[in-house]
Amino acid sequence: MAALLLRHVGRHCLRAHLSPQLCIRNAVPLGTTAKEEMERFWSKNTTLNRPLSPHISIYGWSLPMAMSICHRGTGIALSAGVSLFGLSALLVPGSFESHLEFVKSLCLGPALIHTAKFALVFPLMYHTWNGIRHLMWDLGKGLTISQLHQSGVAVLVLTVLSSVGLAAM
């Protein structure tokens, strides 16, 4: 707003063929620069031994907080995984069948295959169940602290059970 007013006054002065100094007679130079102010701020915080604000150490970790962070992380990981899989399908030579035959020729044990399938399906199931939980919140259901913890535990149990079930297929 101030910049627009200053621009308007400046244009008015130019139109009137006056110098800007005549139009802005009460201009006061700044006492300090932003750099000096930042240096003073950081030196004060250093001498008082203050942590960065807001610092992660001031927060008490809770189940809903950790699950929110994990929900965002799984969303990013799943998006990146799908994008990379699509790009690799376009850029890597050969067909899907040839890559599948290559994996079969490695003779991996069933335990390793089951573990890999579980590791792939776990983030998907967690993001799905926690997404349903978020949709319930959008409906106004389960917003008390005790219900947040109960639904969090339910999401974790459902995630493990559905991941084990899908990995066993």
Swiss-Prot record:
Keywords: Electron transport, Heme, Iron, Membrane, Metal-binding, Mitochondrion, Mitochondrion inner membrane, Transit peptide, Transmembrane, Transmembrane helix, Transport, Tricarboxylic acid cycle. Residues 1-29 form a transit peptide. GO terms for molecular function: electron transfer activity; heme binding; metal ion binding. Its main location: mitochondrion. It comes from the Eukaryota. Pathway: Carbohydrate metabolism; tricarboxylic acid cycle. The chain crosses the membrane at residues 63-92, 113-137, 145-166. One of its GO terms (biological process) is mitochondrial electron transport, succinate to ubiquinone. Membrane-anchoring subunit of succinate dehydrogenase (SDH) that is involved in complex II of the mitochondrial electron transport chain and is responsible for transferring electrons from succinate to ubiquinone (coenzyme Q). SDH also oxidizes malate to the non-canonical enol form of oxaloacetate, enol-oxaloacetate. Enol-oxaloacetate, which is a potent inhibitor of the succinate dehydrogenase activity, is further isomerized into keto-oxaloacetate. Component of complex II composed of four subunits: the flavoprotein (FP) SDHA, iron-sulfur protein (IP) SDHB, and a cytochrome b560 composed of SDHC and SDHD. This is Succinate dehydrogenase cytochrome b560 subunit, mitochondrial. It comes from Bos taurus.
